[in-house]
Amino acid sequence: IPEHNWTRTHAGLFDVSHMGPSFFALPKGHGLEGDEAHKKVASLIERLVPADIQGLKPGQVRYTMITNEGGGVLDDLMIARPAEPGAAGDLYIVVNAGCKHQDWALIEEATKGEANLVRADDRCLLALQGPNAHVAAAAVIDPALAEMNFMTVKRYDAFGRITVTRSGYTGEDGYEILVRAENAADLANALLAHAEVKPIGLGARDSLRLEAGLCLYGHDLDPKTSPIEADLAWTIQKRRREAKDFPGAKRILREYELGAAKKRVGVRPNDRAPAREGVEIMKDGKTIGVVTSGGFSPVLNGPISMGYVEAAHSEPGHVVDLMIRGVPRSATIVPLPFVPHKYHRPKKGA
């Protein structure tokens, strides 16, 4: 809990090197330039995901999912378009640790040698998260980091050569930094020497992402659950909805138009008993859903859960029962996130 609270008020440094960072690029000598090269490489990855990757501007990052033909989710991931000269036709992709070998195989199979997937196995991924992450990053790495917008990517000649996205999975402002393994300890130690930064473990990372209402693959997302059920319709941009050309489009677009039978929601138990994954959600003695993530919220000083319920019961304010050890306990459906996001976005009119 102290680690969680420190990240919400200062800045926490996480080692997330178990994730799956990689680079996906057109073959050398592809002969394409600028937007043309980007559209080509993006069209290849769009065979797997429903997001508009061709529409990424230089330096932009997008959250998306790999979907299957049944409209379920095989993984969620970040895809970035590096802006540097010479990066035309390159994408930077970060997938989840537990799915990385499956994802890489899917990418290679779907793109059949039309582009090269290079795993960043020789690098470490560090996440610096919290309201003062920008202060430490600017002081230790480069003052320009403070000016980066949320969901953008940039490369810096510091600590070797690093790739930085202003992103993360805590609901706070922050960065994810890809650094060569031989430079990682120097970077981590330099950040930890800053008064605002402390090392944070993966237990706090999970409670932070739960407060932020963010999905954990294998729990809140799985091969049977669609992006629409998961309340992630915003990740499917208009061009892809109109083209209807991604895996699972039939089911996903039907649910997009008509609504899904179930929906991911926030659940606040009305007492102190935590409801963890697998707990049934009941209404009038009937099972209407299940908890997929649950735990204690240090910010709210009480238990919180996410889960899926029948759409008819998904509106905030609905009172439900959680079957905890065979005893029904009252809870309320609430909006997500539990704790407001504090991402760094450009000021209006700036």
Regions found by a protein language model. Give the residues of each.
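A generic secondary-structure signal marking the coil-to-beta-strand transition
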Residues: 10-12, 20, 62, 75, ...
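Well-ordered mid-protein domain cores that form the structural environment of catalytic cofactors
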Residues: 47-109
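Acidic active-site catalytic centers that drive phospho-/nucleotidyl reactions
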Residues: 15, 76, 176
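Acidic, proline/glycine-enriched N-terminal capping motif
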Residues: 1-64, 72
